[in-house]
Amino acid sequence: MKVTLCVVGRLRAGPERDLINDYLQRFDRTGRGLGLGPASVVEVEDRKGGGKAAEADLLRKAVPRGAVICALDERGKTMSSPQFADSLAGWRDAGRSDLAFLIGGADGLDKALRAQAEARLSFGAMVWPHMLARVMLAEQLYRAAAILAGTPYHRV
């Protein structure tokens, strides 16, 4: 199951980008034998200032056809890392070939786009800068693959 991070904004070179790349490479290596991956990032940018609706249109175009859509949103469901791993495995086992995670810009995701998503995921009640949300998602993808592979990365 391919995983696409569809995100608003461009991340410059720096520690956040390095962390994302590192965790996604780890996810690809660990997930390959599990039917997970590869992972990619599609960055979209509304240069015309059309707000959340314009960002939503760009994000919709970035989502692979037929993909499970999971929106990251503070109103979404919080879950443990093992629950997240089970969700990934469930979509994979249901024969879904693509999974797209949506991360909005500074104002979040458009309401209609959130409603379109099959799943909504929250990293807690706090609001996170989108660059940190990207890092956290990349790490949780790797952690989920490690849990499913039975490696010692996830310790409780």
Curated annotation (Swiss-Prot):
Its top-level enzyme class, in one word, is transferase
Q: Where does S-adenosyl-L-methionine bind?
A: L72, G104, F123, G124, A125, M126, V127, W128
| GO CC annotations on file | cytoplasm
The reaction(s) annotated as catalysed by this protein in its Swiss-Prot or TrEMBL entry are: pseudouridine(1915) in 23S rRNA + S-adenosyl-L-methionine = N(3)-methylpseudouridine(1915) in 23S rRNA + S-adenosyl-L-homocysteine + H(+)
State which Enzyme Commission number(s) the record gives.
Answer: 2.1.1.177
Q: Where is this gene product found?
A: Cytoplasm
- Primary place of residence? cytoplasm
Name the protein family.
Answer: Belongs to the RNA methyltransferase RlmH family.
Function according to Swiss-Prot or TrEMBL: Specifically methylates the pseudouridine at position 1915 (m3Psi1915) in 23S rRNA.
How does it associate, per the subunit comment?
Answer: Homodimer.
This chain belongs to which protein, by name?
Answer: Ribosomal RNA large subunit methyltransferase H
Question: Can you name the source organism?
Answer: Dinoroseobacter shibae (strain DSM 16493 / NCIMB 14021 / DFL 12)
Its gene is rlmH
